[in-house]
A protein has these predicted regions:
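Helix N-cap / beta->alpha transition motif
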Residues: 1, 91-96, 144-145, 189-192
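Alpha-helical scaffold segments that mediate packing/assembly in large oligomeric complexes
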Residues: 1-75, 197-202
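Extracellular structured ligand-interaction cores
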Residues: 8-10, 85-87, 175
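Short secondary-structure junctions and interdomain/linker hinges
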Residues: 20, 24, 73, 77-84, ...
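Short glycine-rich, low-complexity/disordered patches
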Residues: 23-31, 82-88, 114-117
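Sequence/fold signature of self-assembling virion shell proteins
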Residues: 38-65, 101-202
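Ordered core of a single globular domain
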Residues: 68-105
Length: 202
């Protein structure tokens, strides 16, 4: 297999791994499931009786209530965290983001309807960035500083490997086989500096 084909295969493989981690593992992964680790959402949701600042009595999110529920999430975050130099970020999935956009349009904030991709980098109330994360469950939002959400791997371990096996020398075919093994995990720094809305709703 020539170098260009190998590079294309590796790009596709690593892209697929990253997409799967983002969609299925990083937020909602469960350590007991093969190929997964406890995601940020799983760790936060398990802290229901601990220090996480949960919004009381969450309900399903709609166009009519999304703005007030985002405000409730912000209100649940300790003022010391909101006052820090590094501002917390609001995390939600695509469906929740679309509800938020539609609510802004209905409220007459037409720039939400027209900017499209240029919305990236804009902040709610001029303070809080909204990050759209496909792995977060419906009716669920989190608020945290980026530095409080940790993703780690073990770069020096020999188990971290991506390989391509040219089958021509083994069976005469023009096929290739490829795979990857790696370590990864997610962790929360301070649960008391996390606000959450609606874990468990779907």
């Amino acid at each position: 297999v020539n170098a260009e084909i190998q590079a294309a295969i590796l790009e596709r493989l690593t892209g697929g791994i990253a997409a799967n981690l983002e969609l299925n593992v990083l937020w909602k992964g469960v350590n007991g499931t093969t190929g997964q680790f406890d995601g940020f959402g799983t760790i936060i949701d398990a802290n229901a009786n601990g220090n996480v600042n949960f919004v009381a009595t969450p309900v399903a999110l709609t166009v009519d209530n999304i703005i007030s529920k985002v405000d409730a999430l912000i209100a649940a975050m300790p003022i010391a965290v909101k006052s820090a130099t590094e501002k917390p970020i609001i995390y939600m999935n695509q469906l929740t983001w679309e509800l938020f956009m539609r609510a802004q349009i209905a409220a007459g904030n037409g720039w939400y309807a027209n900017l499209g991709p240029a919305m990236a980098g804009l902040k709610y109330m001029g303070l809080y960035e909204i990050a759209v994360c496909p792995g977060i469950a419906n009716n669920t939002m989190y608020m945290a500083r980026k530095s409080n959400l940790w993703f780690g791997t073990w770069l020096t371990n020999q188990m971290n490997e991506i390989f391509i096996l040219d089958m021509k020398e083994n069976d005469g075919s023009q096929n290739v086989r490829y795979g990857a093994t790696f370590y990864a995990g997610a962790q929360i720094g301070l649960t008391s500096e996390i606000a959450a809305y609606g874990p468990g709703l779907s």
